[in-house]
Amino acid sequence: MEPLHAACTDAELIVTLANGQKVVTPLWWYPRLLHATPQQRAKYELSPFGVHWPDIDEDLSIEGMLVGSKAPGANQPEPS
């Protein structure tokens, strides 16, 4: 489950794995990423098992994303 690329939209985190699979999670699951600037989100480091954003000190494992682990303080936004 090695990540090859990570990207954020306004609503989702998308991580592409070495096997071609894409893991997509709601961005609100990770408040640090949700509130980060586009530049901070674009600056990430890959490891064999996850993604690290050094400017906001956020580390996410692929396994955690797959099982639906949300960061502490994650609150689903109200529908608009």
Regions found by a protein language model. Name each.
Residues 1-80:
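Motif-centric detector for short Cys/His coordination patterns
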